[in-house]
């Protein structure tokens, strides 16, 4: 017998109590999943919040690297990934071999800085992890001169501009959702909504960042809206954040890519949608709790090596 959404939500709540489980969701997952989560946030918030929870089980409604990060920081807890096929392509755009090559080239004055959007194997080979929310602060405090920043090239270029005393070695990884935004996409939105500040995630390309009024992580974008007097905003990041923005600021208007199909819009345009985040459905959260799967399993050695750079990120 098929359950209604209301029945499924009730069953999820019952299973949470039974398993002593907390649901944490990323801003990019579907709205129906965000609505049943105990906590919603970006990668940095979810990493930090997981360490503060008093529970036996964490359901990580996001992609695989987030669940792995949660397990590394909470080795004693059961961490469940509802959508086992929800992976981040960028997380695999760095290799252990390339890290070792750079360490040979710069044996004494190199820091490997790992964006949290990476596999646990890459984290284990790094000196420190960062998120888009704290990357500039963390890198600026490092004593090393050479910075090998993996895996995202666009965030690396943004951080490099804020840390001119460092010499960056760039990897060639990218987030396909943010990297795909063009200057033309942003200019078209600006032409339609000239009074709307443009808020951009630093995973976008440099030429796109140059057009914006504010650069920030997902949480940074959300917080900026709260400090602004503007009534409408152009949001250049994954469209899932629109749920939190409209919930928190119901009196504001938000414009995403693609543009709304209305009188002003003639072509639709590039869509900022992460297909992997959208794999995390209400049904999969229910199934995950019901069957206690997929449990994230990592070796003790791998978790220990990845924990050191991740804990520095939280300091």
Regions found by a protein language model. Give the residues of each.
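Active-site loop-to-helix "anion-binding N-cap" substructures in soluble metabolic enzymes
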Residues: 1-236, 241-315
């Amino acid at each position: 017998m098929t359950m209604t959404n209301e029945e499924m939500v009730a069953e999820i709540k019952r299973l949470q109590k039974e398993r002593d489980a907390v649901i944490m969701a990323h801003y990019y997952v579907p709205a129906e999943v965000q609505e049943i989560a105990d906590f919603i946030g970006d990668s940095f918030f979810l990493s930090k919040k997981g360490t503060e929870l008093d529970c036996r089980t964490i359901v990580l409604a996001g992609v695989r690297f987030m669940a792995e990060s949660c397990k590394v920081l909470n080795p004693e807890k059961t961490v469940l990934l509802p959508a086992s096929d929800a992976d981040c392509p960028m997380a695999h755009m760095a290799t252990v071999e390339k890290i070792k090559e750079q360490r040979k080239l710069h044996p004494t004055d190199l820091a490997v800085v790992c964006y949290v959007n990476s596999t646990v194997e890459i984290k284990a080979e790094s000196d420190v992890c960062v998120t888009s929310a704290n990357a500039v602060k963390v890198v600026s405090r490092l004593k090393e001169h050479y910075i090998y920043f993996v895996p995202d090239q666009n965030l690396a270029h943004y951080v490099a501009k804020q840390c001119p005393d460092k010499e960056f070695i760039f990897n060639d990884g990218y987030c396909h959702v943010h990297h795909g935004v063009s200057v033309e996409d942003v200019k078209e939105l600006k032409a339609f909504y000239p009074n709307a500040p443009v808020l951009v995630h630093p995973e976008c390309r440099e030429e796109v960042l140059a057009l914006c009024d504010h650069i920030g992580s997902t949480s940074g974008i959300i917080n900026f809206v709260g400090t602004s007097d503007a009534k409408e905003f152009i949001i250049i990041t994954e469209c899932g954040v629109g749920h939190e923005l409209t919930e928190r600021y119901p009196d504001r208007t938000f414009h995403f890519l693609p543009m709304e199909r209305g009188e002003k819009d003639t072509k639709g345009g590039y869509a900022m949608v992460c297909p992997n985040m959208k794999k995390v459905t209400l049904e999969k959260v229910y199934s995950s709790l019901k069957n206690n799967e997929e449990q994230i399993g990592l070796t003790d050695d791998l978790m220990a090596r990845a924990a050191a750079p991740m804990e520095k990120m939280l300091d």
